[in-house]
């Protein structure tokens, strides 16, 4: 064997060792690159989860509102949310100041079928409840007759206050838990004027989308209604994801079940005592009282308002008068007489009010693809 061949044989181990070293270096480099990619992806994912919506811009504004037509009210709302959620916008609003207030009847929930839901609850208590109808007072019975007149389209002066007083008395001495169950039992029955719907399911689905949309953009949602506060709590339980403390409504007194007529200043609440309805009306949460309760209970001026009647006018004007963050006020028009128990004359008056007061109208007839869901239909009117 010549020296040249011997030289090649002698170099083989060294070449193999060098090849192995290069292979291991390449593997290590690949592993480092892969690890770096995973680390970067992990950091990005974690940052995305921890970054508040208020710092992410308007990505969330594309969520929901699928039950709305491509209407002016929808455009106004979406454009507004896009402006106030962009950190670099001059109109940016911090999360803690993003507050929206909603009326209930006719704004989130069916207003008349044929009358307000709390009117129907009172009628049932006085005229049908086997445990109470024989105890009903003459004033309560007279109020029921006024409600029947109202159902037929008559104007009954002062009915809202008389009903609130009579209603409070009709449920006196009932515990809060008992009242909650009573209301829910009543709401579990079929809706009088509709097919395939229970009384408690008569929420406007497009408006529930608005609430979801606003909550996705870090809004605090409040209900501010003329309906009794504890009735609303029972109604929205499991339907709208807001704390009980975010519900503002008509007030009646609450006492301890051993308190009797002892003054609040003199009575000491007992351990393990329960709370009951005293049966005494305090205030109807309508008109200027809505502004009063908003500033008392929320402590800030909201930036969005949703209502449907003159009872919501003060609330609407309060919101659009916000000097720190100019707000928007929306008003629903009850102009759908096919899918809903609408009132065209009333809707036209509200539309005029919207034009005069810079409120944004929402047409139930033209702006919504559905009201209660396509499976729900209005019964034929006799």
Spans of model-derived segments:
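Charged, low-complexity surface segments at secondary-structure and domain boundaries
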Residues: 58-67, 149-151, 164-169, 337
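Residue-level detector of functional hotspots within protein domains
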Residues: 63, 85-88, 92-94, 160, ...
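C-terminal cap/substrate-recognition subdomain and adjoining C-terminal extension
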Residues: 13-21, 41-64, 82, 177-382
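A metal-dependent, Asp-based hydrolase signature
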Residues: 113-200, 205
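Non-catalytic pre-domain segments flanking phosphatase-related domains
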Residues: 3-12, 20-104, 112, 119, ...
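Electropositive phosphate-/nucleotide-binding environments in soluble metabolic enzymes
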Residues: 71, 173, 288
